[in-house]
Amino acid sequence: MKKLLLVNGPNLNRLGVREVNVYGKGTLATLEVDMKQEAETMGVELECFQSNHEGAIIDIIHEAEDIYKGIILNPGAFTHYSYAIRDAIASISIPVIEVHISNIHQRESFRHESVTAAVCAGQIVGFGFYGYKLALFALMEKLREA
């Protein structure tokens, strides 16, 4: 069975509590359960990881190449300034789909730019938790094309 990785970055452990007007009331635990179930219906295994620490995210991206077929990544605020995470993504050969719960292009100006998107296979923004499912569908299609 193919294995995929879902990586959530800083503050996403606070989903359901933090800025519910932006991110909704759903929790990270609920999101992870829903995503694992959706992946299972597609015949793949999804493992989930969340960290508030840039180095931990870089480490798991590096390790992912030998374990997983692809990554769904919400880098959180690291999206806008982490060239280290960008370089980690660029250093691996498996596809990465960037996802954001909110539409980063409609928010504060500092959130409009993603330094990580250019090295990802694609970016999905603004569809709430459903965006993660869209990312899963897109990643599966990318893997079929390979």
Swiss-Prot record:
Question: Which Pfam families does the protein's record reference?
Answer: DHquinase_II
Identify the residue position(s) of the site Transition state stabilizer: 18
User: SUPFAM superfamilies annotated for this entry?
Assistant: Type II 3-dehydroquinate dehydratase (SSF52304)
Biological processes, Gene Ontology terms: amino acid biosynthetic process; aromatic amino acid family biosynthetic process; chorismate biosynthetic process; quinate catabolic process
Describe the reaction catalysed, as an equation. 3-dehydroquinate = 3-dehydroshikimate + H2O
Tell me which residues bind substrate.
74, 80, 87, 101-102, 111
Under which pathway is this protein filed? Answer: Metabolic intermediate biosynthesis; chorismate biosynthesis; chorismate from D-erythrose 4-phosphate and phosphoenolpyruvate: step 3/7
Where are the catalytic residues?
23, 100
Q: Name one GO molecular function term.
A: 3-dehydroquinate dehydratase activity
- Gene3D superfamilies hit by this protein: Dehydroquinase, class II
Looking at the keywords, is Amino-acid biosynthesis present? yes
**Family annotation (InterPro entries):** DHquinase_II, DHquinase_II_CS, DHquinase_II_sf
Keywords of the record, alphabetical order, are: Amino-acid biosynthesis, Aromatic amino acid biosynthesis, Lyase
Q: What EC number(s) does its UniProt record assign? A: 4.2.1.10
Which NCBIfam families does the entry mention?
aroQ, PRK05395.1-2, PRK05395.1-3, PRK05395.1-4
Q: Any idea what job this protein has?
A: Catalyzes a trans-dehydration via an enolate intermediate.
Q: How does it assemble?
A: Homododecamer.
Family per similarity comment: Belongs to the type-II 3-dehydroquinase family.
Name this protein carries in UniProt = 3-dehydroquinate dehydratase
Q: What is the lineage of its organism?
A: Bacteria, Bacillati, Bacillota, Bacilli, Bacillales
Write the gene name: aroQ
